[in-house]
A protein has these predicted regions:
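Short, well-ordered coil/turn segments that N-cap beta-strands
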Residues: 10-15, 42-44, 76-82, 144-150
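Polysaccharide-binding and catalytic clefts of secreted carbohydrate-active enzymes
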Residues: 98-100, 104-166
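Boundary/entry segment of secreted carbohydrate-active catalytic domains
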Residues: 5-27
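Glycine-rich anion/phosphate-binding loops
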Residues: 25-31, 61-67, 125-133
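Aromatic-lined substrate-binding rim segments of carbohydrate-active enzymes
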Residues: 4, 31-109, 139
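Active-site-proximal loop/turn and secondary-structure-junction residues that shape catalytic pockets
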Residues: 21-23, 52, 88-90, 155-159
Length: 166
């Protein structure tokens, strides 16, 4: 049987981790230095978007994805591919303020406060609607993007291969 390598440009081995450059959008020098250090460490793939919801959608219905494309382009130009994650585990403050039912209720019957990771109430219709919309928009914008090869949805614990990297 012939051995097949799924990610041939990555030598069959994905090496990297989560990367959160959205905190440095006003500092392109930091992105450049991060990429230099990633290349030095042999990183060939990073996960983007895990905590980006408040940057993607700073106000309800106002979406900004252009910064993500620029970062994906810079990474790709340096031999680093993207696993694109949905940001469902870190909701923006506006969502919790407007839809407090999106926050989990603890065993004590008290609703958790904003700012806790993965503090979502899975049965909240508004939370489910908002995460479905975000997933849909990311898939439409980046599903066929040559820089991304996996789509990660931590809320639903799966990875979806977009395409083989060759």
């Amino acid at each position: 049987m012939e051995k097949q390598i799924l990610f041939s440009k990555l030598n069959g081995f994905v090496h990297g981790g989560d990367y959160n450059p959205e905190q440095w959008l006003d500092r392109p020098d930091i992105l450049e230095e991060d990429i230099r250090m990633m290349k030095k460490a042999g990183v060939n793939c990073v996960t983007l978007g895990v905590f980006s919801w408040s940057v993607y959608e700073p106000r309800e219905g106002e979406f900004h994805f252009e910064w993500l494309k620029k970062i994906m382009d810079s990474l790709y130009e340096n031999g680093i591919y993207t696993i694109l994650a949905t940001p469902s585990g870190a909701r923006p403050a506006w969502l919790d303020k407007k839809y407090p039912e999106a926050m989990r209720v603890g065993k004590n019957g008290q609703r958790n406060h904003h700012g806790v990771r993965h503090n979502h109430c899975m049965s909240s219709p508004e939370y489910r609607k908002k995460t479905a919309l975000m997933d849909k928009l990311l898939a439409e914008k980046f599903g066929q993007h040559h820089r991304a090869f996996l789509f990660q949805n931590p809320l639903r614990d799966f990875y979806l291969m977009i395409k083989s990297v060759h």
